[in-house]
Curated annotation (Swiss-Prot):
GO molecular function: RNA binding
Protein name, UniProt field: Maturase K
Family per record: Belongs to the intron maturase 2 family. MatK subfamily.
Chief location: plastid
Keywords: Chloroplast, mRNA processing, Plastid, RNA-binding, tRNA processing
UniProt subcellular location: Plastid, Chloroplast
tRNA processing among keywords: yes
Function: Usually encoded in the trnK tRNA gene intron. Probably assists in splicing its own and other chloroplast group II introns.
InterPro entries linked to this entry: Domain_X (IPR024937), Maturase_MatK (IPR002866), Maturase_MatK_N (IPR024942)
A GO BP entry: tRNA processing
Length: 504
């Protein structure tokens, strides 16, 4: 890190090119190449493959800049023109993408570390877990009325990405090089592949395009911090990490800001506004009325169109009342239900029955999306009927059982944050029978004959850790497992939503 600091401690007059010199450093590409060995890029690299030549990388950058100023197209369909000094330029261009992502991450790491210095913060590891969101939702959402279910727009123009990055990175040479890469990228129209409720990236250069997408989302989310700080004087710790930029509202002329700006801030002044995002989906909950949520919806659509110059469909934002509708988020169906209670008040001669109703946040396991994921991974059909997995038939019996058991344990652990997990019994049934059919297919036998020969060995692989504890402690108490499925259990290592298709 001392080598990195040398470029960031220059005089302010020399800071306009502080990133560009790092692109020509060999250890940057060693870190980028070894990114799979270490989760953090700031660990010391263990080495790199000798088949890469960093000298060729530096020469290639110079060659690209020359081509850019000569207005020649670098990427063509002719394989002979994709050679530079006898090397495949696509391979080294991918390395430059990865190296650029590493370089851009460095100033943010230094800025974040300096931001944490002198601040007393509880560094709790479990705050990184997705299960830490549900206690927050249970505490906050039970007092709210409406929620906006938002799908963040993804088809953003490449030049807007560069302009967004310009507010964070003060290096014109690096931005020109980035602009050239993006416009000459062969599949630039499919950098971010749209999905129904999420987003995905092409397998090549995932780190680089994920970084650009995070810039885009950060710029989009900064509007909430801006309005929050303008509408109230409450101190927000998270807002301190955002950097000042050109005020976006000056670019919106006609519909959104036709009234006085203070009046608009008064409309959006809501001390009970909460925002949560995961990947390409976010929720905005409020204690206000449906009129306020419709104004938020109208405002966000115009904000995307006027500031990001992208057309956004209003159907990407749904308004739902928490007491009547369920919210599909992170694989859970969450809602706020009225829990009735009756209190009997006894006086000297008379008694009264008082009915009360309290709001309770509830989360259920969404069985339909899970069956759809199992069907996509070829564990079952669309109706949930188990099928064999032919591609795993060449594995050993223990590997097959371990894979199926691991998939179920991951799904069970992820959905353990729900109070009602009885639908997981159906997922266990699908995976167990799919495992049995795969093994029977391998041994050219029937499922009944194979299960009779295997016995309870297959069953034990599909016990979660909690079930094993209760099963060993109370082997004859079958009701104990049922009580377990009515408890909320949180884990500190749930960093991503469980998807059976990722276990291929």
């Amino acid at each position: 890190m001392e080598e990195f600091k040398r470029y960031f401690e220059l005089d302010r007059s020399q800071q306009h090119d502080f990133i560009y010199p790092l692109i020509f450093q060999e250890y940057i590409y060693a870190l980028a190449h070894d990114r799979d060995l270490n989760r953090s890029i700031f660990f010391e690299s263990a080495g790199y493959d000798k088949k890469y030549s960093f000298l060729i990388v530096k020469r290639l950058i110079t060659h690209l800049i020359t081509q850019m100023y000569q207005q020649n197209h670098f990427y063509t369909n002719d394989s002979n023109q994709n050679k530079f000094l006898g090397y495949n330029t696509n391979l080294y261009s991918q390395m430059i993408f990865e190296g650029f992502a590493v370089v851009v991450e460095i100033p943010f790491y230094l800025r974040f570390r300096s931001f944490l210095e002198g601040k007393e913060r509880v560094k709790s590891h479990n705050l990184r877990s997705l299960h830490s969101i549900f206690p927050f939702l249970e505490d906050k959402f039970s007092h709210l009325n409406y929620v906006l279910d938002i799908l963040i727009p993804h088809s953003i123009h490449l030049e807007i990405l560069v302009q967004t990055l310009r507010y964070w990175v003060k290096x014109p040479s690096s931005l020109h090089l980035l602009r050239f890469f993006l416009h000459e990228y062969p599949n630039r129209n499919s950098l971010i592949t749209p999905k129904k409720s999420s987003f995905s990236f092409s397998k090549r250069n995932q780190r680089f395009f994920l970084l650009l997408y995070n810039f885009h989302v950060c710029e989009y989310e900064s509007i909430f911090v801006f309005l929050r700080n303008q509408s109230s004087h409450l101190c927000s710790i998270s807002s301190e990490t955002f950097i000042e930029r050109i005020s976006f509202y000056k670019k919106i002329k006609l519909e959104v800001f036709t009234k006085d700006f203070k009046a608009i801030l008064w409309v959006f002044k809501d001390p009970f506004l909460h925002y949560v995002r995961y990947r390409g989906k976010s929720i905005l909950x409020s204690k206000g009325s449906s009129l306020l949520m419709n104004k938020w919806k109208y405002y966000l659509v115009n904000f995307w169109e006027c500031y990001f110059y992208m057309w956004s469909q209003s159907r990407r934002i749904h308004i739902x009342q928490l007491s009547k509708n369920s919210l599909d988020f992170l694989g859970y169906l969450s809602s706020v239900r009225l829990k009735p209670s009756m209190v009997r008040s006894q006086m000297i001669e008379n008694s009264f029955l008082i009915e009360n109703a309290s709001k309770k946040f509830d989360s259920l396991v969404x069985i339909t999306p899970m069956i759809a994921s199992l069907s996509k991974a070829x564990f079952x059909n669309v109706l949930g009927h188990p099928m064999s997995k032919p591609v795993w038939a060449d594995l050993s019996d223990s590997d097959i059982i371990d894979r199926f058991g691991r998939i179920y344990r991951n799904l069970s652990h992820y959905h353990s944050g729900s109070l009602q997990k009885m639908s997981l019994y159906r997922i266990k049934y699908i995976l167990r029978l799919s495992c049995a059919r795969t093994l029977a297919r391998k041994h050219k036998s029937t499922v009944r004959a194979f299960l009779k020969r295997l016995g309870v060995g297959l069953l034990e692989e599909f016990f979660t850790e909690e079930e094993q504890v209760f099963y060993l402690t109370f082997p004859k108490a079958s009701x104990t497992i049922g009580k377990l499925y009515r408890r909320r259990i949180g884990y500190e290592d749930i960093f991503x939503x469980x998807d059976p298709x990722n276990h291929e």
